[in-house]
Amino acid sequence: MSVDRVMLLIDADNVSVDVIEQAVEWVGKHYGGPHVRRAYCTAESAVQHQQLFKRLSIRPMVNLAAGKNSTDIALAIDAIDLAIVERPAVMVIASSDSDFAPLVSRLREKGCRVVGIGQQGKTGDETQTVYDDYEVIA
């Protein structure tokens, strides 16, 4: 199925390389490929995953700010901005982080269908139920 305006936002500091690869593949299979592919990460992660990002056409969104949740905050700000400006049909967030629950609720209020993708064994049931759909990847 092909859907207009699909956005894939990856918490690259929170999921493995395998999950990133499988997330891109899964989104392509289910929605016809994401129009926006962004990975939010530290500078160290960006360098480490540079070849992966190039191969999968993922734009690294490097966060230079220090702090525990600074990458998560950058992803959340972009997600809201994209929801308002781009009006995507589907927003996919690849993360096993439960901190995104308020963001998911807000995106749904903005009319986005929000799908989560996370790592098996790292995402609690309570986190998964916030999303419209949630795909667990091994």
List the predicted regions and their residue ranges.
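Domain-level signal for Mg2+-assisted phosphodiester chemistry and nucleotide/NA-binding surfaces
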Residues: 1-84, 106-108, 113
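Residues at the N-termini of beta-strands
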Residues: 36-38, 90, 133
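Short, glycine/polar-rich helix-capping loops at beta-to-alpha or helix-loop-helix junctions
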Residues: 45-50, 119-127
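Short, acidic/turn-prone active-site loops that include or flank metal/cofactor-
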Residues: 64-69, 118-123, 138
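A glycine-rich beta-strand to alpha-helix segment
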Residues: 79, 83-125
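Structural recognition of alpha->loop->beta junctions
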Residues: 124-138
